[in-house]
A protein has these predicted regions:
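Glycine/proline-enriched, intrinsically flexible loops and inter-domain linkers
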Residues: 1-156
């Protein structure tokens, strides 16, 4: 599948880091592809993304309205589910909170918002994945060696 997709529907914008940092009192500390987040399958599901924002200056209120936190994106025709949506709030004192997937929250100055966008489900049995495609997945960091062994039956 396609990784870290933004769609022109709903609230699925992929706002550039520079725009976020110029528009809001945040610093983007991480924006990465989530390894092993796409469901295993003959056709692997697209990987989700991990985004980490640090709140600068003052206490900030935010809101979230996300799906697939309780039931991850499903696989089809024998493919496995993708990873679920996750959000956590890291306070400067080390405390971690997990807000609901729909609602408002407060983050103190210097706190972090960690948001993991779900991966999509795979299609078809993982045992039928093309070995060259799986090798590319490993090389690109989309699939870990552990997941290749567990989900695709690759011997190390």
């Amino acid at each position: 599948g396609i990784n870290c997709v933004a769609a022109g529907i709903s609230n699925m914008m992929n706002t550039p880091i520079e725009v976020l940092e110029m528009s809001f009192p945040v610093r983007v500390e991480e924006y990465s592809v989530l390894t092993d987040s796409g469901g295993a399958g003959q056709f692997r599901g697209g990987c989700g993304a991990r985004r980490v924002w640090r709140v600068l200056g003052n206490v900030t209120r935010g809101a979230v309205c996300c799906e697939r936190s309780k039931s991850p994106p499903f696989g089809l025709a024998g493919g496995q589910a993708g990873s679920p949506m996750r959000i956590s709030l890291e306070d400067p004192d080390g405390g971690i909170r997990h807000p609901l997937s729909k609602g408002a929250f407060t983050v103190p100055a210097d706190g972090r918002i960690v948001f993991e966008v779900p991966g999509s489900g795979g299609y078809g049995p993982a045992s039928e994945r093309d070995p060259a495609s799986l090798a590319d997945d490993l090389k690109n960091g989309y699939v870990s060696e552990e997941a290749a062994r567990r989900d695709y039956g690759i011997k190390s």
